[in-house]
Structures are given as C-alpha cells and as structure tokens.
A protein has these predicted regions:
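Conserved hydrophobic/amphipathic alpha-helical signal-anchor segments
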Residues: 33-75, 79
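Short, functionally important structural connectors and interaction interfaces within domains
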Residues: 2, 18-20, 27, 32, ...
Length: 163
C-alpha cells in the first residue's frame, strides 16, 4: 500500500523559520526608528506654541526677546508662555525659549519615558528672518553645552525640519 505524504518536511520548516528570522532582523530596528521619530514629533508639536509666540513677538517688536538663557523663564515670560517646566509631554521634559535670537529648545525625558535613542536629547529650533518672514531650522546642537551629554537625534527629525 502506498502512503501519501502530508505536512511539511523538516527542511521546509527550517527555511520558513530562517525567512521569518531575517524579516524580524530587518523590521525590529525600523520599528525602533519609527518609535523615536514619533516621540520627536511630539516635541515639535509642543514647541509649535512657542514658535507662534516668537513670531508674534518679532512681528510686534522687530526683534527677538533679549536677556534670556537656558533653563530660565525670562523669555517664556516675555512671550506670554508658561514657565518651561509647565510645557511638558509624555516624552518631553520641557520647552523653553533661550538666547537673544529666539531659539526654542526642547529636552526629552530620560528612559524609560522617552525611547533610549532620544533619551535626554535636546532639539533646537532656530528662527531665520527672510525679508519679513521667519523660517525654522531644527538641530540638536544649537543649545548643546558642556552640561548636556545629548544623543545625536538629527536622523529622527522630520525632513521638513532639518537644516
């Protein structure tokens, strides 16, 4: 009597497992990047209120706020914004306006709140005036000082924001 083969052979199962392993090896790092990008997007959304305040201040006064430094609320107060520790998010520690050039800085929380790829990272939004209009460029080095050991999160910024 002839026996019919049913099911998969061992080699076929091993090939399927190998293919799944290769797909997982590619997909997991891409997912990690996606999570980091989404968390950076939250920070940029939180900074949009400060961007509006800086633009309105510049339109009315003809200059950016002065006498500001990192970690103090002098600029936030001049712009009518709440203190920097009040502008927070799930992944963002604070948003502050610093320097006499209208730079907006946002710092991400430490892990596990923020993804380890961006934890404690700093993003700077730098305004540039072009004949009456203001454009914004993002980086993570304009506010980086010796007391910040920040990761390079430039690759997680949206393409519309990069310098």
């Amino acid at each position: 009597m002839k026996r019919l083969n049913s099911g998969f052979t061992l080699i076929e199962l091993m090939i399927v497992v190998a293919i799944i392993g290769i797909l997982a090896a590619v997909a997991i790092p891409q997912y990690q990047n996606y999570v980091a990008r989404a968390q950076v997007a939250e920070g940029l959304t939180l900074a949009s209120g400060a961007k509006t305040a800086v633009v309105e201040y510049y339109d009315s006064k003809g200059s950016f706020p002065s006498g500001c430094s990192i970690g103090f609320d002098i600029c936030n107060t001049q712009l009518g914004l709440p203190e920097h520790t009040s502008i927070t998010g799930k992944y963002v520690k604070h948003v502050t306006v610093a320097g006499s050039s209208g730079i907006i800085g946002l710092q991400f929380k430490d892990a596990p709140d923020a993804h380890t790829l961006i934890a404690k990272g700093v993003v700077s939004l730098t305004p540039t005036v072009h004949g009456g209009s203001i454009s914004w460029a993002c980086s993570n080095n304009a506010l980086a000082t010796t007391h910040f050991l920040t990761p390079d999160i430039t690759k997680y910024l949206p393409s519309s924001c990069k310098e």
